[in-house]
Structure formats: C-alpha cells, structure tokens
Amino acid sequence: MGYFIRVLGVYNDVIPLDELEAALERDELNATLSADQEDDPWSVIDVLSAKGSRLVQIEKNFVFPGCLAQAELDEFRLLIREHQPLSAVQWLDGYFDRIKVVYAFQVFDVAMIDDNYEVVSSLKRAIWGKSGGLLQNDLEGFSNDEGYHILWQFPDDITGDKYCAVLDNGAWVKFRMDLGDPFQRMAFWAGEVPQMAVRL
C-alpha cells in the first residue's frame, strides 16, 4: 500500500505537467508521468518507472471549507498535539492557516528499490519549489518552510542523521543531529539544540 508524504503549499499556482517532466530530465531521471486529464491543471498524476512499475501517485487538493485538504489540516492540528517539541506544535498550528493546497504523494513499495526514490524526491522538490510551505512525512513528522525537520514523529528505532531546527525567540536555529542518540532526542523534544549536534 505504501505510505504518504505531503507538500502543504502556500501558493496554489498551476504547475504544468511539462515542468515536472523537465525537472526529472534535469536530474537525469527516467520516468513517465500520466495525468488524469490531458490539459493542465491536473488533479492526479501516476508516476511510472522506466520498467512500467507505479512508483507514486500524486494527488492535488485545494484548501477550502468542507474539502478533503481542509479535513487533513484539521486532523493534523489534533495529531501534532501528541508530539514534540511544543514550540513546533504551536508554530505549525498557526502556519496551517496559510496553507492553500495539499499535494499528497502515495509512495508505493517499488519506489524503495534501486534508485527509484530519486524520482519521488525530484518531483517533491519541483512541486515544493513552486508551492512553498511545509513538508510532511508519515512516521517522521513535519519540516518547516525551509525544509528543516521540526516535529518528532519518528518510531523509537530510528537511526541516522537529520537536518533539524528548533525555535529560539521566534527564529529557527538549524543543526544536524543523530536521531538514534537518546540524549539528542530529549534535547530536541524539549525544543533545544542538542549539545552534540552540529550547528549549521
């Protein structure tokens, strides 16, 4: 079934299909994009690998009262209250009011094979570059509008480095932390820069 990543955009400009195809070409990636309608603007895109496997489906939904995207934002408002740091929860709660469009990427298992995920990443960068706003990954959390991770929703067994940020007097302090280090985790949860993290 795969999992979801999302771009929560503050600009709802039309992103033509050929712009996304051009982004893949710039990154020297081979994939086929199939939209739900021949002319822009599209609502759903299926992305197929060079071998014809479906890597990801991208669905675009504008935010307005009673719509699916608004329901997602309302659900996120409730969900983030269970996570840390509190300063990021409060910041996100206010930022959600600015979101105008949600791009939901349903990522299928085959995207994790070989170099397929590079296609997903390229399309995400291209869309985020036009729409601005936030990034959200299931089982990871949220990144701010600069792309730094700000809310912890990782599983307990997560390891590896991550570029993160915490708020200090309203400004983001950026750093690289070890997600597997329990002491760095506790500092991040408290909204502090971990002592062993590398400031950027």
Features from the language model and the residues they span:
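Non-membrane alpha-helical secondary structure
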Residues: 12, 65-68, 72, 84, ...
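Short, intrinsically disordered low-complexity segments
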Residues: 18, 27-107
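Short acidic, S/G/P-rich loop/turn micro-motifs used as interaction or catalytic elements
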Residues: 12-14, 108-113
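Terminal, regulation- and interaction-focused segments at domain boundaries
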Residues: 1-13
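Acidic, proline/glycine-rich low-complexity IDRs
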Residues: 1-4, 20-30, 111-200
